[in-house]
Amino acid sequence: MSTSSLRPSERVLLQRVRNQLIDYLEIAASFEAQRDFQTQAPETHVATEVLEQWADWVSSNWREELKTPTFSEQERNAITLFQSVWQDTHNTLVRPLPALDYIQLAPAWQQLRVAAEDCLRVFMLRGKLSDVEEAIG
């Protein structure tokens, strides 16, 4: 068997990225999940992780990268809306970011949480896709 046949297809790789976005949104959309993350990883600055992880998965060229049919048009629209709020939040908050308990009081952080919740709701219409096989449709 050649090594090229072991490499996942582009679609499967995009499905994995999509699943990672769902994981991210589940944390960004929930103050409780953020606090749980902080408890489980006390050495991690969760506010920074929540703010910066989005950029790890969604580049400035995301419209060309996060393609249909892996990402539905509804999901792409939800990303556009969340990206706008994320960018505003990213540009508004002071650095270094305060501790999680304090940043959760900030209006910009609260708006980010609501936007993440809205985006997640759209993604969960289809839920997570396979990490190993191409999803149909």
Task: Label every PLM stretch briefly.
Residues M1-N61:
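Short terminal alpha-helical segments
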Residues M1-T3, D131, G137:
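Intrinsic low-complexity, intrinsically disordered or marginally ordered coil/linker segments
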Residues S30, D88-N91, V122-L125:
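Positions within ordered alpha-helical repeat solenoids
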Residues A33-F37, V94, P98-D101, K128:
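Short, flexible helix-adjacent loops and helix caps
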Residues V58-D118:
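Amphipathic protein-protein interaction modules
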Residues V94, M124-A135:
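Structured alpha-helical bundle/scaffold domains in large eukaryotic membrane-trafficking regulators
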